Amino acid sequence: MKLAFIAYRDVLDDRVATSLDEIGIDFYTEWEEVKGKGHKTDAHLGNRPFPGYNTVRMIAFEKEELLEKLIFKINELNSIVEREDDKIRLFQLPLE
């Protein structure tokens, strides 16, 4: 089993939601208006100097095949995102 976190700019939420539906993922926990800064990326703090927020979705996978589909879909979405800072990030951990 694996636990995945996907972090992305809030403006990409519709694309991410549609992608999850397309691959059959209808289970997750979501945090909205998440503030933060990634390695070599712009901060998203919801204020004037650092506008915008992130959204984070946590998804537990019993089957790694579904996680692999998600990874493929995120890579597909990232291929059309223009700014490196705006790419979707996926982090995965073992889950017991």
Give the label of every model feature segment.
Residues 1-96:
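Positively charged, small/polar-rich N-terminal and surface patches that mediate targeting and assembly
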